[in-house]
Every structure is written in C-alpha cells, then in structure tokens.
C-alpha cells in the first residue's frame, strides 16, 4: 500500500457578480443614474446616446458562466424615468460538472417609469445547468418591455444540447398584484424534450417578449402586423402574440439562432419605434 497521501484538489472558484442600480429623472427630462454598486466581474457601462432614455450595458468580464457561477442584477427606475438595459454580447452557459449556474434579475418601476430589458441571447452548451429568475414590480401606470432569447446550441458550429437542466422563471407584479407568471423547465434529455410538438416542435432557439403597460392590449394588432412585416414565415420562424389584462406577449420559435435574431430585431425595432442598442450590431 502506498504511503503517499491522496491529493486534495482545490475546489473550483465560483464567479459571483452583481450590479445594483437606481435611475431617476433630472431637470430637462433626461434620465440619470442615482445609485450604482458593482461586485465581481459584472459591470455596467453607460454609452453616450441621443435621446431622453438612459442606456445601460451589462458587461461580464468573465466571458461566460458555468458550474455554480452566480450573477444578479437589481434595477430601480424612479418616477418618470426612462431606461434601456442590454448586454455587450450573448451570454454563454457552459457545461457543468454538477453545480447549477444562477442568474437573477429584479426590476422595480415607479409611477410613469419606463424600462426596456433587452439582453442579447443566452447560448446554452451541452450539459449546461441553469436556473434563471426574473422578477418585476411595476406601478400601475409604468411601462415595462421584457425580451429574452434562449439558444440551445449553435447549429452553425455543429453544437447540440442533448442533456442539461434549464429552469427559467418570470414573475411580474403590477401595483402589488401578480399579473404574469411563466416557468420553463427542461431536465435531462433536453433535445428530446424540445423535439416534442407540444414543447418546441424541434426548435432550437426560442424567445419571449412581454410588454406591460396601460395601453398594451391596444397594440396587439400592430404587433401582429410587425410579425408579418418581419418576414417570420420566410425565415422559418414561428410567431404568435396575445394580449390580456394590460399585457402583450409574443413567442418566437426558430430552428437556429440567426433567423430568430433577425426576426426579433425587426420586431423589436418596429415595436419600440427605435433602433436597438448599438451593441446588438457588433
């Protein structure tokens, strides 16, 4: 029997990042930061853009997430303020040897506040383990636009997510009352689950747009017109929209990320009447 001790390998260092910000309306009708705290590799950048809205770009200097990494964003948009939040690039969730990667976003909007939450897509690798949660509390007269896209492997590079664990939960409250709850859960054989007609019908890129505002329901016909104008059918993107109780919801399904991104870009720009943040074009 060997007298040498069994080596004790150091545990992988987990990456933890958090951005907490506040935004408020200042003289002249523009929005400025009122508070900002950053920890770990997650940072906020404020590019100079024209217009009254403040644009914030979230930057992950770690380059990706895996194996128990934790990222969180908390944003409080004050009365009458207007902000856009996006990311510098697509977020990558790498294969995990067990621990779950956690991403959380907590959004609060005061009276007449506006926020467009427009991160670029999240790309999942085979064996990824992800738990993502988005919660929002908005005033009755606030306007919140949420967009998120998930890509299950980049088909152009021959990637397929055969196995993994995905939990994606959205909770939206207006005036203290829960008005929207949506949870996606895929465990184990992810590719097989996505192939089922009742889930994704073989789609490998999915996106959701939720718009909560007093006039949300009146914009349904316009959104459906944008779906047609975006050429979703020609791109092979399935799209459907519905509206109820001050909410407008759009779902997009595509065989891969490129047509989904193309359709989403056209729809988002038409819906908001503004170009997407410049980082979307790089």
Swiss-Prot record:
Keywords: Chaperone, Cytoplasm, Nickel insertion. InterPro entries: UreD (IPR002669). Pfam families: UreD. One of its GO terms (cellular component) is cytoplasm. It comes from the Bacteria. Its main location: cytoplasm. Coiled coil: none annotated. It is found in: Cytoplasm. GO terms for molecular function: nickel cation binding. Signal peptide: none annotated. Belongs to the UreD family. HAMAP family: UreD. PANTHER family: UREASE ACCESSORY PROTEIN D. Required for maturation of urease via the functional incorporation of the urease nickel metallocenter. UreD, UreF and UreG form a complex that acts as a GTP-hydrolysis-dependent molecular chaperone, activating the urease apoprotein by helping to assemble the nickel containing metallocenter of UreC. The UreE protein probably delivers the nickel. This is Urease accessory protein UreD. The gene is ureD.
